[in-house]
Amino acid sequence: MKVGIYLEGSPEMGGGFFQSLKSSLLLLDIKRYYPEIELIITHKKTEEYFQKKKIKNKLFKLNKVYNYLSQLFEINYSRELLSKIRINHPFYNFIKKQKYDLIIFLGPSQMSKFCHEVAFISNIWDLDHKKNSQFPEHNLNNIYELKEKLFKEITTRAFKIVVPHKSNKNDLINFYKVDENKVIVQNFIPMLPTIYNENKINKELYNDLFNKFKLPLDKIIIFYPAQFWAHKNHKYIIDAAEILKKENNKKYLFVFCGGNKGNFNYIKNLISKKQLGEFIKIHSFLTDDEVISFYLNSHGVIMPTYCGPTNLPIYEAFYFKKIIFYTKDLIPNDSINNHLIKIDISSPANLCKELEIYNDTERLDKIVKDNYEYYKLVCNENTFKENYEKILNEFSYLLNRWK
């Protein structure tokens, strides 16, 4: 049985890519199937990363022609015409040439539409286009319609669907009437701890990286690692900073980092207009090691997002022993709530109140210690590999019926 792991994107694309990268490394470490598992990548920069790691991979380079063909295959009459003249999508030709029996998509990918008779597994991280459709990122350029079409295809044709939380599973069942046995829950496992452990012998590197930003060391630094999407709700922190400014409370500094996903200029201009430069700093893009330096040297992490339920910074904060302020009630019926500083994102004043936790060092120490132990429990790499090995075993058994 030959398996292809489809890793789409490159390191510049942020958290989703690194989540997929970590998953791909763990999949390659499943001993029983390792000789039969190959990595499929789509960007040259990703190829360079794996070359340094001496990990073999196959490059399926996405380009404008492929994107145009993908659009043509979306249109009924052009799809029928292409079929008549026996033109297949390049991705289908690629996977057939490589003789894959199964493709593992580490995130929802348009390429899954072109697998045809080749079986596939797909990860789906969230269904926020359904639950938070009011945000522009779910509506611009027909994003909602495209996602709906893709998710209907995945939920109909995928051999298995992997989601990060039980509430994601419930959403899939409710929205798309998926057989519950088809959906596997596998928690996020972040990549940053792996990168940190590889460099751990050089701890001074991280201090030097952090110090180059010349942030005031007399302030409590709270880190928000998130792309500038509207649903990430940076505005909530701006509103809280306004309250702190009115109270002349200058103890706190919020640091934003992330790529522009349409909301960067709005947030940047608001900070300038409200003269909050003393309370909020922005770094549009940080390297992996710079992000780690902020996790190590900040006093906490914040994520007032509307979308989830879970997000990578939760587990990164747990690993690096930092408290995290997180949206209240976003993660239903889960013990993880005992490890979060829950904030009411309808009330910026609530965040200001919750910041008082920094006056209780004993409570802080207990929280971060408990969170680290919880991380080891729920982000267990062996559990991840066991879950995927069960899926591969099940498919291998079925494949043996005809091959």
List PLM regions with ranges.
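Carbohydrate transferase catalytic cores enriched for Leloir-type hexosyltransferases
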Residues: 1-403
